């Protein structure tokens, strides 16, 4: 945001120097990024009268001018074409240093001596562009400093505003802050507005079809204007803040934008079909050509201003080429409105179309400024372009904003800031920036009820008001103190501690954590081959998605992790151990808010070990992933788990997957990803995946085990081999073994599985090793054999096992 010293003084009669003002603004939170002293060091640029203008004898595009600047008459060679004898111009005499460190020297141009330079506005730093040299009023006496004669000596401040301060995107907003700093009154100059006899409502109408996106829309009709160049004062004002002059009507709207901070738009009334305005959403794929002559494809989320036939402006962003004010325009319809910040930001971002108007609307304009800005603009247009303002303003206001009140306790202000401010001090600070304050004295507590004005959308809570008090009282006035109170160490919540524990287990197992967006494309579930009635196909939709590919909340971590595999494999990184531990979001029929559930998803693919001369090229398989799951279960002390040799998940291979259960509760699924799913993700190698319900895991977890000393007595092992039916999983065998063992059994390990020669069809041979140990004695062979026989009998009785 750019403001100038002189423009601020039109609103506040302050006495601060330019440097002091810059310091005070910065300390008030409006950081001054740069200062530019307009006209500084240019006192030697003086008014001069052209005595004669002759063609250069050796150059068709140059002229030789005799210039009278009061003290003397000098010869200057000039390349401009817009001057003649008798004109008063700006002469930079020899020795002058112009902006850009350009020093004027005596020179010889095509054989003709030149003692200075006739300057344009651009060369003097007064404009971004210019068509010729600067022609001044013929009444100016030669020899006077140009910047003094025109009153152009000024200081330009460029402010680095934070997004939460839209109120300071105007000269008025910054002046309000200056008024609060120096305790001077704020003077808002609103010129009188004269109206004609014709009624505005008889000639036009305004219809708002979407009050959510456009809570307020006002319009005035001005007839008989003459579009042309703006007067010098208006051009200078705009150029001082970096704006280019277009024509008198458009310049007035830009002037109001910069001074009051409210965007306006002028339509050519005669080019509006049926002479009326309709505010509504655009049609999908609707084509619209904006003022920059670019045809843009609109969406249903875009708000447009229409006439009786179609769109004439992209609301809050840019006008349309089909209704712009041109030299032939006679009647104009002037728009002043308030648009939903989110809607404007979404449209501006999607179309990559930024403007001064969208910059203000998307941060939050002042809805109360709508009629004020409109009336002042109408009065100025009549002043600079003529015409008559039709009687009455159309002001459609279907959705007034609710009044916002915040209660602030004096004690809370002082506790946070370490000050001893009284109620009157705090009240004075808040009143100085335009807030309404009502003191409320209660028993032992002084409070202020503060009504927040519409130009401060950033003030929502009492802590925001505390910040305002600190800012206005002066950060320099906050005393330096040592921290008060006790230093307390707060443990993180239990849930976060458990999350960290699981992360540590995965990292210790050699996995790398990934973090993906919680937003995915609606088509993500198709690639997982989910059934049509799967509840994960009903995701929570985002109201304002950044893109269509991130328009719904994810109901599973699987698509995101498989996309990580796809990207890594594409970069020749195919040996992967990845996991993600994050929430998913499921819809709930009885509640507006979705259900948030934490899940763990992990993938394995490629080589088991990193490449090296001592390592082999063995690939990971299902049992590598199963081992990781066993580490998780052991870390969380989850007991009595079964491995169901089937999975209902369509994204897993039906013959190479299983479901992890504790009794009837499903803890998760794991297995090889289905080939169809791998093909959908462009993955050409086997991938093993774990999808674990973290919350069910915590519910199944046992307490932390107590300390158990190692036995100092020897261990004895017994091996047994037996035949069982092929379809009996080891989890069922393990359950029988666990039930039949006594206190002497320390461990049971399956160390061999055999199918083939000598084994009947439909059978498999399993070999187990049982280790026995006592804590208080050396075991005798009779004790060990008795315990081992009990295990063998249980296998025969429960599973029909045949001992080999």
Curated annotation (Swiss-Prot):
Cysteine disulfide links: none
Reaction catalysed by this enzyme: tRNA(Phe) + L-phenylalanine + ATP = L-phenylalanyl-tRNA(Phe) + AMP + diphosphate + H(+)
Alphabetized Pfam families for the sequence: B3_4 (PF03483), B5 (PF03484), FDX-ACB (PF03147), tRNA_bind (PF01588), tRNA_synthFbeta (PF17759)
Compartments (UniProt record): Cytoplasm
Description of how the protein assembles with itself and partners: Tetramer of two alpha and two beta subunits.
Alphabetized InterPro entries for the sequence: aa-tRNA-synth_II/BPL/LPL (IPR045864), B3/B4_tRNA-bd (IPR005146), DNA-bd_dom_put_sf (IPR009061), Fdx_antiC-bd (IPR005121), Fdx_antiC-bd_sf (IPR036690), NA-bd_OB-fold (IPR012340), Phe-tRNA-ligase_IIc_bsu (IPR045060), Phe-tRNA-ligase_IIc_bsu_bact (IPR004532)
EC numbers on record: 6.1.1.20
Binding site for Mg(2+): 458, 464, 467-468
Major location category of this protein: cytoplasm
PROSITE patterns named among the record's database cross-references: B5 (PS51483), FDX_ACB (PS51447), TRBD (PS50886)
Cofactor note: Binds 2 magnesium ions per tetramer.
Residues annotated as domain tRNA-binding: 39-147
Family membership: Belongs to the phenylalanyl-tRNA synthetase beta subunit family. Type 1 subfamily.
Domain annotation B5: ranges: 401-480
Protein's recorded name: Phenylalanine--tRNA ligase beta subunit
Stretches assigned to the FDX-ACB domain: 711-804
Cofactor dependency: Mg(2+)
GO molecular function, one term: ATP binding
A biological-process GO annotation: phenylalanyl-tRNA aminoacylation
Top-level taxon of the source organism: Bacteria
Ligase listed as a keyword: yes
HAMAP family per record: Phe_tRNA_synth_beta1
């Amino acid at each position: 945001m750019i403001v100038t010293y002189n423009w601020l003084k039109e609103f506040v009669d302050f006495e601060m120097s330019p440097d002091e003002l810059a310091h005070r603004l910065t300390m008030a939170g409006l950081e001054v990024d740069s200062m530019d002293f307009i006209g500084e060091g240019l006192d030697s640029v003086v008014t001069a009268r052209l005595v004669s203008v002759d063609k250069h004898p050796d150059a068709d595009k140059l002229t030789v001018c005799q210039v009278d600047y009061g003290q003397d008459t000098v010869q200057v060679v000039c390349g401009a074409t817009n001057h003649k004898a008798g004109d008063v111009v700006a002469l930079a005499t020899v020795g002058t240093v112009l902006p850009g460190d350009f020093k004027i020297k005596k020179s010889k141009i095509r054989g003709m001596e030149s003692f200075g330079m006739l300057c344009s506005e651009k060369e003097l730093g007064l404009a971004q562009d210019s068509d010729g040299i600067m022609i001044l009023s013929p009444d100016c006496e030669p020899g006077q400093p140009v910047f003094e004669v025109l009153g152009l000596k000024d200081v330009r401040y460029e402010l680095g505003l934070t997004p939460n301060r839209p109120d300071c995107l105007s000269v008025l907003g910054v002046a309000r802050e200056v008024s609060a700093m120096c305790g001077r009154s704020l003077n808002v100059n609103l010129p009188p507005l004269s109206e004609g006899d014709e009624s505005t409502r008889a000639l036009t109408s305004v219809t708002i079809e979407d009050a959510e996106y456009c809570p307020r829309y006002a319009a005035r009709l001005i007839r008989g204007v003459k579009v042309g160049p703006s007067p010098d004062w208006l051009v200078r004002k705009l150029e001082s803040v970096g704006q280019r002059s277009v024509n008198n009507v458009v310049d007035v709207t830009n002037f109001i934008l910069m001074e009051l901070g409210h965007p306006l738009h002028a339509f050519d009334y005669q080019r509006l079909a049926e002479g009326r305005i309709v505010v509504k959403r655009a049609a999908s794929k609707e084509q619209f050509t904006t003022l920059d002559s670019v045809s843009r494809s609109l969406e249903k989320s875009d708000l447009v201003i229409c006439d009786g036939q179609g769109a004439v402006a992209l609301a809050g962003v840019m006008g349309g080429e089909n209704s712009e004010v041109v030299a032939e325009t006679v009647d104009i319809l002037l728009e002043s409105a308030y648009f939903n910040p989110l809607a404007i930001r979404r449209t501006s971002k999607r179309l990559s179309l930024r403007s001064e108007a969208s910059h203000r609307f998307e941060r939050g304009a002042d809805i109360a400024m709508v009629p004020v800005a409109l009336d002042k603009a109408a009065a100025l247009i009549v002043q600079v372009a003529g015409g008559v303002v039709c009687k009455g303003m159309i002001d459609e206001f279907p959705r007034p904003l609710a009044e916002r009140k915040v209660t602030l306790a004096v004690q809370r202000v002082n506790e946070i800031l370490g000050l001893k401010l009284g109620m009157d001090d705090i009240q004075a600070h808040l009143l100085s920036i335009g807030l309404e304050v009502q003191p409320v004295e209660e028993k032992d507590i002084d409070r202020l009820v503060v009504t927040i004005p519409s130009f401060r959308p950033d003030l929502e809570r009492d802590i925001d008001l505390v910040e305002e008090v600190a800012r206005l009282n002066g950060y320099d006035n906050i005393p330096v103190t040592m921290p008060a109170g006790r230093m307390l160490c707060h443990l993180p919540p239990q849930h976060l501690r458990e999350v960290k524990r699981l992360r540590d287990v995965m990292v210790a197992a050699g996995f790398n954590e990934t973090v993906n967006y919680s937003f995915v494309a609606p088509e993500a579930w198709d690639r997982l081959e989910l059934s049509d009635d799967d509840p994960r196909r009903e995701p929570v939709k985002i109201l304002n998605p950044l893109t269509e590919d991130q328009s719904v909340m994810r109901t599973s971590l699987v698509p995101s992790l498989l996309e990580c595999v796809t990207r890594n494999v594409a970069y020749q990184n195919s040996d992967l151990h990845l996991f993600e531990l994050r929430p998913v979001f499921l819809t709930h029929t009885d509640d507006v808010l979705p259900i948030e559930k934490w899940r763990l998803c992990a993938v394995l693919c490629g080589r088991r070990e990193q490449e090296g001369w001592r390592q082999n090229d063995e690939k990971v398989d299902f049992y590598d992933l199963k081992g990781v799951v066993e580490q998780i279960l052991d870390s969380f002390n989850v007991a009595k788990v079964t491995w169901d040799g089937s999975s209902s998940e369509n994204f897993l291979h039906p013959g190479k997957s299983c479901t992890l259960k504790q009794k009837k509760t499903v803890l998760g699924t794991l297995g090889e990803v289905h080939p169809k799913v791998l093909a959908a993700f462009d993955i050409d190698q086997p991938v093993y995946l774990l999808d674990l319900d973290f919350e069910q895991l915590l519910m199944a977890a046992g307490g932390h085990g107590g300390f158990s000393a190692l036995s100092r007595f020897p261990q004895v092992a017994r091996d047994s081999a037996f035949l069982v039916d092929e379809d009996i999983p080891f989890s069922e065998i393990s359950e029988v073994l666990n039930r039949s063992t006594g206190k002497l059994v320390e461990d049971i390990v399956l160390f061999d599985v055999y199918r083939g020669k000598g084994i009947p069809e439909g059978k498999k041979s399993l070999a187990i090793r049982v280790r026995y140990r006592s804590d208080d004695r050396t075991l005798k062979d009779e004790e060990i054999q008795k315990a081992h026989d009990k295990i063998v009998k249980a296998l025969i009785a429960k599973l029909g096992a045949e001992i080999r």
